[in-house]
A protein has these predicted regions:
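Arg/Lys-rich, positively charged N-terminal/basic patches that mediate binding to nucleic acids
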Residues: 1-24
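Amphipathic alpha-helical interface surfaces
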Residues: 9, 25-29, 64, 76, ...
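Basic/aromatic recognition patch in beta-strand/loop cores that engages polyanionic ligands
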Residues: 42-83, 87
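Residues that form generic nucleotide/phosphate-binding pockets
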Residues: 16, 32, 102-105
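Enriched for short, Lys/Arg-rich terminal
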Residues: 70-110
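Compact soluble domain cores
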Residues: 12, 21-41
Length: 110
């Protein structure tokens, strides 16, 4: 069942996604998240962030981009970070700790 979801981008996400994906590729991801908001894998140690694969260019999802997002409520998703898999495999412990602080702030704002 579809329902309305508000997507909010961090400034970091906006900068990163512009470098790696087209508007249509981003729209395709947002449609996937509307269909299944909890689609991404939970990232341990981040306070609830999820990581999802995103197809970009002529690459499939497996070797393409990664998007980190936070499902704050059933109808609000924060888009936090994005990167090409070829440039980064996963988050470092320091990044996870910083992102956990962010998720705590976002939870407090609900």
């Amino acid at each position: 069942m579809n329902h309305s979801i508000e997507f909010i981008e961090t400034s970091l996400f906006t900068r990163q996604i512009r470098m790696i994906a087209t508007d249509d590729e981003l729209k395709a991801l947002l449609c996937e998240l509307i269909e299944s908001p909890a689609k991404g894998d939970l990232i341990q140690g981040t306070g609830g962030l999820r990581k999802v694969r995103m197809a970009t260019g002529h690459q499939g999802k497996r070797g393409s981009a990664r998007v980190i997002y936070f499902l704050v409520t059933d109808d609000v998703i924060w888009l936090v970070m994005a990167w090409q898999k070829s440039t980064k495999d996963s988050l470092s412990a320091a990044e996870k700790a910083a992102l956990k602080k962010l998720t705590q702030q976002l939870k407090g704002g609900v």
